[in-house]
Amino acid sequence: MGEAPSPAPALWDWDYLDRCFARHRVCISFGLWICASSCWIAAHALLLYLRCAQKPRQDQSALCAACCLLTSLCDTVGALLARQLTIQVFTGAYLAAIDLVNFMFILFPVCGSKFKSNSDREARERKRRRQLRASVFALALPLSLGPCWALWVAVPKASATIRGPQRRLLASLLQENTEILGYLLGSVAAFGSWASRIPPLSRIAPPPTLGITTQHEIWRGQMSKPSQSPSRSPSGHWRAAAQRQVLGTEMCRGKTFPSIHLWTRLLSALAGLLYASAIVAHDQHPEYLLRATPWFLTSLGRAALDLAIIFLSCVMKSKMRQALGFAKEARESPDTQALLTCAEKEEENQENLDWVPLTTLSHCKSLRTMTAISRYMELTIEPVQQAGCSATRLPGDGQTSAGDASLQDPPSYPPVQVIRARVSSGSSSEVSSINSDLEWDPEDVNLEGSKENVELLGSQVHQDSVRTAHLSDDD
């Protein structure tokens, strides 16, 4: 025959503790509860440090904190009425005290008040008064349950017995069945503890990665801007734009928890698992487990939801690192790598550009300079090539002229761009054709500073050309 289930001990049954530690046999249930309590204390200490040491954030509203406090009170009162274990009553009382302190900190923030800004003082005061009214109402609701329950229990019962059939009032039915009321309060506490983990879960949202849409937006933003100086890095602008885009999207669509907050969640989940193990380790009979089902499900549900919050937060942080470029470069998309590689190559080419050969028409400063000069005079740019030891090919003809090798200058490297402008000058008394070769480096000419001189030179060349044409017609 099976062993009869042991009756639940009273709240202050010292014989139970004596039997638990008798003959050097440590009670497993009590030891697991001690470990769970240590984890809870460490988690709440970290939360207090996080609230006071860092800039405060309104992670939890006053109404949510009031619901958590009401849940803890229901858990404690339900364990007391249902004649549960002493460790369950103490655990509920401790969690209720912690929720009360948290609720008071939300109502009257003491730590971190120096971080508040002084802007929009009136709007902040109105919001504070509105929150204070809602918080006082939420505080009065759970605190009124204790005195009402005490008055309800203190009502004396009628000593006279009434014979015959009669109706039983609901109050007398509840007074005679306090264990049923305790189980109901335990069930309410279980659902309330699960619901208190929904706001942190809704706060977490997967961030968008740096995909094709973001790259097109960055490209359009860069193309719409005016041309920048070559000294500024295009890749730096693209990276900065990408980071601003991803950070703005992260602020709108998802928020992460600090590392300390994740550690508190982990300790709380571990404490919940140890607490559930302590309840199960006390007695394994089905009758006892059925009576302790609300508190057992409460601890397991909170632990599972805390682990889910930790997992989702870690996944979101890893995606954020990948989107911001802190992950490996191999994980980046091909479009991102192509954009950044082209920008870096263009920057290196602009920095290492010391000279431009005559055979190459670059599209940088020299091209812009020649384009500006071509509006005023006709230029002929031809490279000077050495045909032999004493023969040089002159620009403008296809023949070579022999010259003294000793009088020729050695070719300079890199070659200097030679601009030959044929200017004919004449006067009214005599006609003399002077072919002058003007040599200068377009890189040394500041067209923007001497625009008037270039216009004057162009007009003079035009007048001389007209005079030469008239004299040729007269001859």
UniProtKB/Swiss-Prot annotation:
Q: Where is it mostly found?
A: membrane
Show the segment(s) annotated as Disordered.
Answer: 390-475
**Can the keyword Nucleotide-binding be found in this entry's annotation?**
no
Q: Where along the chain is composition biased (Low complexity)?
A: 424-436
Name used for this protein in its record: Transmembrane protein 44
Q: Which UniProt keywords apply?
A: Membrane, Phosphoprotein, Transmembrane, Transmembrane helix
Residues modified as Phosphoserine: S465
Extracellular topological domain: 1-29, 83-88, 157-179, 281-294
Give me the Cytoplasmic side stretches, as residue ranges: 51-61, 110-135, 201-259, 316-475
Q: Where in the cell is it found?
A: Membrane
> Which top-rank group of organisms is this from?
Eukaryota
Where would you find the membrane-spanning parts of this chain?
30-50, 62-82, 89-109, 136-156, 180-200, 260-280, 295-315
The keyword Transmembrane belongs to this UniProt entry's keyword annotation? yes
Bilayer topology reads: Multi-pass membrane protein
Biased composition, class Basic and acidic residues, residue ranges: 464-475
A molecular function annotated in GO for this UniProt entry is: basic amino acid transmembrane transporter activity
A Gene Ontology term for the protein's cellular component:
membrane
Say which species the protein is native to.
Answer: Homo sapiens
